[in-house]
From Swiss-Prot:
Signal peptide: none
Stretches for region Disordered: 1-22
Cellular-component GO terms for this entry: chloroplast; ribonucleoprotein complex; ribosome
A biological process from GO: translation
Protein name: Small ribosomal subunit protein uS11c
Length: 138
């Protein structure tokens, strides 16, 4: 008969520390991508490595509620809460897109207590590039 294989320890008990290495980040960049359907907030360090991110969809908003200013405010608050715990004090904000959540996300970032060095609008604007799609007929 085959001998039973003894397991030493369980998978649950092996991981004691968190997988993410907690590092002090004094300065960062907050990217806000506000479309009409969703708002995505990404916090990176100055080199561009992602530290934290959140979107209206991950905060539990579904359908048309994802594009609302309140959803953007909630997403920005969730993304920033994690980096404030890691010691971020200063940040620059880059806002992209035409969505309703632009101002609400910026308001939530200001309320978080992080000092903002500047706020920049990086929405891509064509210099009369591609031809737009034909006009919708409803």
């Amino acid at each position: 008969m085959a001998k039973p294989i003894l397991r030493v320890g369980s998978r649950k008990n092996t991981r004691s520390a968190s997988r993410k290495n907690v590092r002090k980040i004094p300065k960062g960049v907050i990217h806000v991508q506000a479309s009409f359907n969703n708002t995505i907030v990404t916090v990176t360090d100055v080199r561009g490595r992602v530290i934290s991110w959140s979107s209206a969809g991950t905060c539990g908003f579904r359908g048309t509620r994802r594009g609302t200013p309140f959803a953007a405010q909630t997403a920005a608050g969730n993304a920033i809460r994690a980096v404030v715990d890691q010691g971020m004090q200063r940040a620059e904000v880059r806002i992209k897109g035409p969505g309703l959540g632009r101002d609400a996300a910026l308001r939530a970032i200001r309320r978080s207590g992080i000092l903002l060095s500047f706020v920049r609008d990086v929405t891509p604007m064509p210099h009369n590039g591609c031809r737009p799609p034909k006009k919708r007929r409803v």
